[in-house]
Amino acid sequence: MTQDELKALVAQAAADYVLANVPEGAVLGVGTGSTANLFIDAMAPHKARFAGAVSSSEASTRRLQGHGFTVLDLNEVDAIPVYVDGADEIDASGAMIKGGGGALTREKIVASVASVFVCIADGSKLVETMGAFPLPVEVVPMARAAVARQLAALGGQPRLRMTKEGQIYKTDNGNVIIDVVGLRIADPKGLESVVNEIPGVVTVGLFAKRGANVLLLGTEAGVQRRDF
């Protein structure tokens, strides 16, 4: 199967998980990216069953609304039973690198409210040690040079994210992203704490302190489920 076919497979598996485990009238938490988009599409026929969804990005909001979902502000919501999102990398403990799509801060906020984080990914995303995928760090613009120096001191090579048009990439929150390459992340929780303490960092795309509870992994043999 192609990577796109594997993504579609796990997206449908996530929809099946939600339908089996989330009560009617609940609010869904929805992530960002190509796999999350397929999950949104798979849930579209069942939108009337739920009170609405909390989205982690403007892009996901547009896709949800295009399917007729009610998109709620997180401040209006008391509880989210399940948050479904993809990952750029995930290890055997359920820790993840996220933020390749630029929505890491809102993803981390929505995930923190959810009772269960369901990660959906194709088999290539499961790794022994994270760091091959560049680690995204959302940064207040005025602090980007200072933060980059501190990230370099940690052993990484910081690179300011740019758009295809050559402009500085801006998040939905108006901040910039520094992608750090060359890291071998042996202690995800420790590195998450260290980077988040750098003044000017909004958040780092390490989801270790609040990792996945369930992984639905698309493989040639079908969808494998892992619980953490």
Curated annotation (Swiss-Prot):
Domain of life of the native organism: Bacteria
InterPro entries, per the entry: NagB/RpiA_transferase-like (IPR037171), Ribose5P_isomerase_typA_subgr (IPR020672), Ribose5P_isomerase_type_A (IPR004788)
Residues annotated to bind substrate: T32, G33, S34, T35, D85, G86, A87, D88, K98, G99, G100, G101, K125
Annotated GO MF terms: ribose-5-phosphate isomerase activity
GO biological process, one term: pentose-phosphate shunt, non-oxidative branch
SUPFAM superfamilies, sorted: D-ribose-5-phosphate isomerase (RpiA), lid domain, NagB/RpiA/CoA transferase-like
Biochemical pathway: Carbohydrate degradation; pentose phosphate pathway; D-ribose 5-phosphate from D-ribulose 5-phosphate (non-oxidative stage): step 1/1
Catalytic activity, as annotated: aldehydo-D-ribose 5-phosphate = D-ribulose 5-phosphate
Cellular component terms per the entry's GO annotation: cytosol
Keywords attached to this entry: Isomerase
Membrane-crossing residue ranges in chain numbering: none
Pfam families: Rib_5-P_isom_A
NCBIfam families xref list: PRK00702.1, rpiA
Quaternary structure and interacting proteins, as annotated: Homodimer.
Name of the protein described by the UniProt record: Ribose-5-phosphate isomerase A
Lineage: Bacteria, Pseudomonadati, Pseudomonadota, Betaproteobacteria, Burkholderiales
Gene that encodes the chain: rpiA
